[in-house]
From Swiss-Prot:
Membrane-spanning ranges: none
Name assigned to this protein: DNA-binding protein 7
Species of the source: Metallosphaera cuprina (strain Ar-4)
Keywords: Cytoplasm, DNA-binding
Single GO MF annotation: DNA binding
Broad class of the protein's primary localization: cytoplasm
Subcellular location: Cytoplasm
Amino acid sequence: MATKIKFKYKGQDLEVDISKVKKVWKVGKMVSFTYDDNGKTGRGAVSEKDAPKELLSMIGKK
């Protein structure tokens, strides 16, 4: 089963499949990421404690 990342962006509750995530980096206690949003680049962030371990393992990798 594919992992989904749930996060808030600009007041909206969003969810993205981890297979669409392109880049992941850490900012303080937050994990930020970009993802493919149907041809556009979407952005998201989730707290380190709420991030799935699959996302944490992608930090710094392309």
